[in-house]
């Protein structure tokens, strides 16, 4: 789909992160302009011209590579205005287009010598070391030009493939090879630096190595077996992703778009720049110097030193401080590399992609709401009016209370009773989501029915606290409003707090009474030592139903721990040890009375129960009545 602003919409199924091949890196940065010119390679370390304040050509902010700094205007100013769209200026070579292309167009730096990628060399585990089946220390010695490695032992009897040699050892072997009496025809080959590493990785035939490892694993055990499995797993991943091991050594490095590493002018005329520009500048300077040294056929020791410095510059760009000395800028502050921008809490993923601010959300301190039902939460009116504002405006206009959105907003700002009435109608049956960070499991975000409350704190039912791992010592929670009917339905069906009683991890109840609930239940049902037990028939202590006991307690005629006789026709689980009744009496009308310690039953002539009185405390009646009432409502 394309509109007049050249915006394109690409549909894709998934995002896949794999190793990039050298060709892919070049593809990212290389473009062919409409006039057939190929651009993309950054060859100069300059950023902007200090007099004209325009980007330098072929530099880190080059307009030819990355696009124009100003919309529809080329570098030299020959073409201005949108009518020249797509034209490439003959003088400066800049394509006339929007400046926002500088946010996604990349460049590349073609390296004069291969360089190892520090993530794969110095990461934990080191994938390069695992693939080559060499100690990491040895691989580092090769990459940083401390030791030679044997790439091909030739006819030399003492040399082995992948053996390390110091400078002196290799000089001795060279003397031996080129001596007049030498019998070596097939000369051994050695290498040093990332070039040698690349050669070793290219020599790996992954399917063959995987097959050999599987055979070795079947006949080995213990630590050796674990090491072989570790290596096989890495090789299998390379095969599965169609990646080559030598891609871990870079021939070209991508240059990220200039608007992602900006340079801005401050009030005093000075410039503030992203650390990445300094790191890229070091790489380009060293790369250009190395290319020049190679051109003039400089001594090997000087070229080798420059290659090592280039390796260190690329290491600092990718992950500053991972190896060697940390590169610092002004006032001894370490420069932020690409890895520092991506990783950690303040990194691109956690801060900007996963931690985005979202619309229709808010946050506030939580306080206990003991009078709420479990599926309810108290939402401050001030917060609710802001979160549900579009719904309130829609309803105000639909009910002809106001004529337009502007009038509705003015009315909402006054927050009079009419608006509050509409807000109450809007939130009725509209669930909201409450989330407490850190969301460690799925019960860290649950749905509730909002109830409007005064104040500025969110009220939370105490029973849902264990699921959120919340307490009321200053914890904050975020509120989100599901907008679509589908998301509201999903929230109500799947995420409502009263539907999430069991822990998804263990299957045990996660909503269990605690603290004052347990204490209150204990206090209600506790028996007071030494309390007098009334005789059955005592008018002040015998009641015809549970409600009568509660009314008497509310009228303060009886206390919470007083014993009472109360008529109760339900099932009674009696823990009385006496199987026979204490007293049995046959009345003149043929009915029979049986009395136990805590129960008095009356039966008719056929043995059917006529009435039952139980001896209990007022607190236990309150507890029982409350449970029956709650179950009946549910």
Swiss-Prot record:
Cofactor note: Binds 1 Mg(2+) ion per subunit.
Cellular component per GO, a single term: DNA-directed RNA polymerase complex
Enzyme Commission number(s): 2.7.7.6
Catalytic reaction equation(s): RNA(n) + a ribonucleoside 5'-triphosphate = RNA(n+1) + diphosphate
GO molecular function: DNA binding; DNA-directed RNA polymerase activity; magnesium ion binding; zinc ion binding
Residues noted as binding Zn(2+) in the record, renumbered to the chain: 74, 76, 89, 92
Record field: transmembrane: none
Domain of life: Bacteria
Keywords: DNA-directed RNA polymerase, Magnesium, Metal-binding, Nucleotidyltransferase, Transcription, Transferase, Zinc
Binding, Mg(2+): 471, 473, 475
Enzyme class: transferase
A Pfam family that the UniProt record links to this protein: RNA_pol_Rpb1_2
A Gene Ontology BP annotation from the UniProt entry: DNA-templated transcription
Cofactor(s) recorded in Swiss-Prot or TrEMBL: Mg(2+); Zn(2+)
Assembly and oligomerization: In cyanobacteria the RNAP catalytic core is composed of 2 alpha, 1 beta, 1 beta', 1 gamma and 1 omega subunit. When a sigma factor is associated with the core the holoenzyme is formed, which can initiate transcription.
NCBIfam families: PRK02625.1, rpoC1_cyan
Annotated family: Belongs to the RNA polymerase beta' chain family. RpoC1 subfamily.
The protein's name in its UniProt record: DNA-directed RNA polymerase subunit gamma
Organism: Prochlorococcus marinus (strain MIT 9313)
Gene: rpoC1
